[in-house]
């Protein structure tokens, strides 16, 4: 795999090359200064940032803040609107350029568009967080905005991929709309430090695109071979042991409350669900629920830990299996596909925690640092053995990218099903979607 810097040297930032992300900014006005302050605070403190904190950081009284925005939601709406305007501009500009003469290689065009999307996501980190980890809100306009898919960039990516197929670069059996959606969602994740950390957006975007296009595996593995691996069997063995916590015994109050809370959080959303709602659904008094599980934050932490332990069991079993690094990477993707399919409520609740955490949090979630160490070790083993194409100088950056790619977006999983989602993961992580040179 080529180094992430290879195609970006000597070129202007991708956001300038495609679509000019940030043109919507009307710097100099007091309103814009407040928006910049709010975005900076949310990036460092998360969505729990209050109006009082925004006013203090902007150097104005809270009352003066209301002259510009009548609520915190109004600030969030404006941040999201500007973010979406910049994404649309990138997509529209890229689509317009598709009709222009361009002799550059197909992967360079895909990487350029991906980098532009990634840079826009980094620039609008606070808005990205609200859109990427969308959650219920009492404000209908905010809900509508966060649920709008970035159609312009998806269409631009789809048309770029179609041009790549016409040229013979993209494999004929790859579903291009699904791939375009996947690439765009992946590029937007670059705006979150869990993917990018200390690397530049251009570096990470190029690395992600090269993994998706070329694959990690030095030799392209077949589905039948991967299905027969010891690692895949180990993953299935753990998946079969996963219990459905919704079937908790009502006599076990703690387990019963946790099971009810999962369903209520998944149905209503973490932010808007109250302890009173959980108590009512569980048929218990509010005081009893508080005694059993403590605060809502403690309940969220407990649910996250339970979900993380299920995934951890799969990782441990796969990594201990007698299998190659490529087979283990495949089996870990299968663990993730099944975890998302079986425990979608828990996954959405985990996103609620992500919404409350700053987008520059580098190691979110339960046991992420452990997963990162394990992935670095697995990738290093594969590179030494010649099974995995050599990545960038930083194994940490490669590991963060691979962990992110192994989680299929839920909308894609629901649309295609578990088996097709696994094949998609194999195509975009191991084999690559581009035709390999013989």
Regions inferred by a protein language model and the residue ranges of each:
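Conserved hydrophobic residue
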Residues: 47-48, 170, 388
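C-terminal structured domain segments across diverse proteins
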Residues: 310-314, 331, 338-435
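Short, basic, alpha-helical segments at the C-terminal edge of helix-turn-helix-like DNA-binding modules
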Residues: 81-88, 305-313
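C-terminal peripheral helix-coil segments that are non-catalytic and often amphipathic
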Residues: 1-18, 119, 123, 155, ...
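Amphipathic alpha-helical segments used for helix-helix packing
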Residues: 118-144, 158, 229, 328, ...
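Helix-turn-helix
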Residues: 33, 37, 43-74, 78, ...
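Hydrophobic alpha-helical connector segments
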Residues: 78, 92-127, 176, 205, ...
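Amphipathic alpha-helical packing segments from all-alpha helical-bundle domains
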Residues: 130, 140-167, 176-180, 184, ...
């Amino acid at each position: 795999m080529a180094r992430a810097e290879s195609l970006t040297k000597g070129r202007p930032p991708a956001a300038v090359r495609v679509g000019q992300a940030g043109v919507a900014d009307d710097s100099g006005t007091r309103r814009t200064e407040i928006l910049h302050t709010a975005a900076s605070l949310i990036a460092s403190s998360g969505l729990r940032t209050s109006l009082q904190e925004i006013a203090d950081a902007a150097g104005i009284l809270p009352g003066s803040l209301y002259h510009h925005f009548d609520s915190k939601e109004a600030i969030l709406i404006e941040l999201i609107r500007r973010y979406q305007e910049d994404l649309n501009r990138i997509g529209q500009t890229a689509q317009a350029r598709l009709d222009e003469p361009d002799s550059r290689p197909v992967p360079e065009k895909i990487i350029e568009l991906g980098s532009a999307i990634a840079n826009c996501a980094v620039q609008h980190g606070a808005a990205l967080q609200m859109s990427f980890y969308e959650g219920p809100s009492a404000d209908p306009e905010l809900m509508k905005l966060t649920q709008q898919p970035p159609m312009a960039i998806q269409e631009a990516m789809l048309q770029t991929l179609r041009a790549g197929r016409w040229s013979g670069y993209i494999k004929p059996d790859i579903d291009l709309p699904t791939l375009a959606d996947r690439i765009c969602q992946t590029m937007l994740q670059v705006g979150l430090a869990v993917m990018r950390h200390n690397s530049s957006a251009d570096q990470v975007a190029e690395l992600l695109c090269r993994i998706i296009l070329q694959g990690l595996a030095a030799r392209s593995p077949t589905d039948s071979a991967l299905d027969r691996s010891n690692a895949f069997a180990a993953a299935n063995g753990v998946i079969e042991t996963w219990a459905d916590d919704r079937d908790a015994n009502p006599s076990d109050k703690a387990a019963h409350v946790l099971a009810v809370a999962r369903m209520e959080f998944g149905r209503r959303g973490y932010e808007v669900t109250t302890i009173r709602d959980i108590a009512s659904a569980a048929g218990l008094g509010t005081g009893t629920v508080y005694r059993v599980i403590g605060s809502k934050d403690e309940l969220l932490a407990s649910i996250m830990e339970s979900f993380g332990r299920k995934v951890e069991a799969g990782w441990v079993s796969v990594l201990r299996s007698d299998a190659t690094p490529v087979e283990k990477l495949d089996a870990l993707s299968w663990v993730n596909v099944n975890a998302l399919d079986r425990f979608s409520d828990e996954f959405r609740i985990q996103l609620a925690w992500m919404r409350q955490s700053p987008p520059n949090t580098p190691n979110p979630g339960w046991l992420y640092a452990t997963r990162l160490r394990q992935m670095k070790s697995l990738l290093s083993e594969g590179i030494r053995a010649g099974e995995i194409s050599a990545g960038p100088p930083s194994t940490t950056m490669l590991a963060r990218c691979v962990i992110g790619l192994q989680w299929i977006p839920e909308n894609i999983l629901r649309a295609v099903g578990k088996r097709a989602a696994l094949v998609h993961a194999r195509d975009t992580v191991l084999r690559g979607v581009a035709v390999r040179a013989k």
